[in-house]
Structures are given as C-alpha cells and as structure tokens.
From Swiss-Prot:
Binds 1 FAD per subunit. Disulfide bonds: none annotated. Gene3D superfamilies: FAD/NAD(P)-binding domain. The keyword NADP applies. It catalyses: 2 reduced [2Fe-2S]-[ferredoxin] + NADP(+) + H(+) = 2 oxidized [2Fe-2S]-[ferredoxin] + NADPH. Belongs to the ferredoxin--NADP reductase type 2 family. It comes from Lactobacillus acidophilus (strain ATCC 700396 / NCK56 / N2 / NCFM). This is Ferredoxin--NADP reductase. Pfam families: Pyr_redox_2. GO terms for molecular function: ferredoxin-NADP+ reductase activity; flavin adenine dinucleotide binding; NADP binding.
C-alpha cells in the first residue's frame, strides 16, 4: 500500500483475506492530509459517525492494523520494477500487487502572493495542528473554500477572526458560512485581495484592495492562516508507467490501473461520476483488495464481505 488513511484501511481489509501487507508513507506520520493538515477537523461523511476528527479517525485505523501490517514512514517510494509475477519496490520489497492511495499526492500549499520578509513569515501559517495556539489573538484567515471555512470556525473558538476572500461567494458548505456569519468574533471581508504586508509594532498590517475600488483598506492582525489550497503532485506514478489524467490515475471498475497488478483507490483516482469523499474511498479500497484476491487466487471461493451468509 502506498499512501494515506485509505492505505491503512486497505491493509486491514487485506488482512481479513489473509494477505500480508506493508504500508509506505512519505510523511513522518501515517494518515495523509487528515493527519498532517487538519487533525482537529470534524469529518462528517464517515458512516456510523455523526462526526469524527481527523486524528481520531487515523488512530482508529492504526489500532485496527497494529498487529497486522508493517508501516514504513518517511519513505517516498521512488522505483517500482515490474517482474513476471510481481514488483520490486525500491530494491527492498517484493510485492505481488500494489495499491496506490496517495490522495491528491504530494501537497505543497499555495502561498500568499506577496513579498514577505523572514520576520513576517514566522507569523504566516499554511498548516494548523492546534488552533488553541491563537488564543486571545486577532487572526486573518485567507481563502474561500471548505478548508478556509473549517479553519475559520476552529480558530474562532479561541480568537477573533477576519475571514478574507477575493469573492463575495464562498466555495464551501453554506451551513459553515451561516455559522461564521452568526459569530460575533468573526468578521467576513469580501471581495478583497491582499496587496501589501508590513510588520508594525509586532503586528501584521495588511493592505487590502476591494475588487473594483482603488482605495485600500488596512487591517491589523497578530497572525495569518492561508487556506488557498494545495498544489497536488502524483507525477511519481508516471515514472512507474501509470497513465495520468492531469494529476489523477484512471482506473477500471476493479480499481486497476493500466498496469496489471497495480491498483488505486481514493482521491488519487478518476472515473466518470466520482466525487471526492473519504467514505467512497473506503469502498474503492475494498474493491481493489477483492480484485487482487481474484487475480492471485482465481481458484478460491471468495468471501466478499464480513456480512456474507
């Protein structure tokens, strides 16, 4: 398994079928974006959980496989060499099959498009693991998507928030927009673009330009959280000979890529009608494991799921 939280689930489901697995993760911790980018965020699309944080979800998945699989962190898989009946991974592991579950891939944040000194950079954040670090401060949150809205709501539990977006309309859940508008310690500034940033008396002084208006507006902030999204990169797959559509991997209904023995699941994949939901990815991981079992053991009568009679 190569990749994020779906790799953990796929390893567990593979163990149920008697397969031996290894999970590789290029990061220092397994779990992908939910663990590294927004561990405190409440995830609402997991069946049987009304709401669960990224950290709690990862911990439950890790607990399921703690005695079932080997996890190798801080290891970016570079070379995959096809053999007659399997693959050699980085000259250290032989595997009969591979599942890629890297999500959006290696992610690099889109930065605030301003000239910024090193002193100011210390007050600008692209990752927030603990929003309580902003307690009793005034924090600017830049962005208009789901991540920006989620971050603004979490930070608002501890600080005053100014949510700054270049459009009047947000690209996140309307329910979150309504929540933010109802909070007295949240000010929504739209449609504004940041034009200049300075450090004055240990505070950030941001010059904002309203769309269609020449006059600038200045706001003072203690720190800034930038949620403009991330530049994804799954180009490693191309090196392995896997076809890509932009940054995604096309798969067939069995979750197989264009290479026999290599499968993919989660937000890394693309096919008509797919939506980027964690819950959907769990099902894709199960389909991939089932396909691997049928390929490796065609003579076996396969129990597809735990509720089979």
């Amino acid at each position: 398994m190569v990749g994020d939280l779906l790799g953990l689930f796929a390893a567990h489901f593979a163990h149920l079928h008697g397969l031996n697995t290894i999970v590789f993760d290029s990061l220092s911790e397994v779990g992908g974006q939910p663990q590294m980018l927004y561990p405190f965020k409440q995830i609402n699309d997991i069946p049987a959980y009304n709401s669960i944080s990224g950290t709690d979800l990862i911990q439950k998945l890790k607990h399921d496989i703690k005695n079932e699989t080997e996890i190798i962190t801080n290891h970016k898989v570079v070379d995959v060499t096809k053999q007659s009946d399997g693959f050699i991974i980085d000259n250290i592991i032989y595997a009969r099959s591979i599942i890629i579950a890297t999500g959006a891939g290696a992610f690099k944040p889109k930065e605030l498009p301003l000239k910024i000194s090193d002193e100011i950079k210390e007050k600008i954040h692209y990752f927030v693991k603990d929003p309580s670090q902003f307690k009793n401060q005034t924090i600017g949150v830049f962005g208009g998507g789901d991540s920006a809205l989620d971050l603004a709501l979490e930070v608002a539990k501890y600080a005053n928030v100014k949510l700054i977006h270049r459009r009047d309309q947000f690209r996140g859940l309307e329910s979150n927009v309504k929540k933010l508008k109802s909070l007295k310690n949240v000010e929504i500034l739209t449609p504004y673009l940041p034009k200049k940033i300075e450090l004055i008396n240990n505070q950030l002084d941001i010059s904002l330009k309203k769309m269609g208006v020449e006059q600038l507006r200045n706001v003072q902030l203690d720190q800034i959280v930038v949620a403009y999204g991330f530049r994804a990169n799954n180009r490693f797959a191309k090196k392995w000979g896997i076809n890509l559509e932009q940054s995604n991997i096309p798969v067939d209904p069995t979750m197989k890529t264009n290479i026999d023995g290599i499968y993919a699941a989660g937000d890394v994949v693309t096919y008509p009608g797919r939506v980027p939901l964690i819950a959907l990815g769990f099902g894709e991981a199960q389909i991939a494991i089932t396909s691997i079992m049928r390929n490796l053991f065609p003579e076996k009568s396969l129990t597809i799921h735990s509720t089979s009679i």
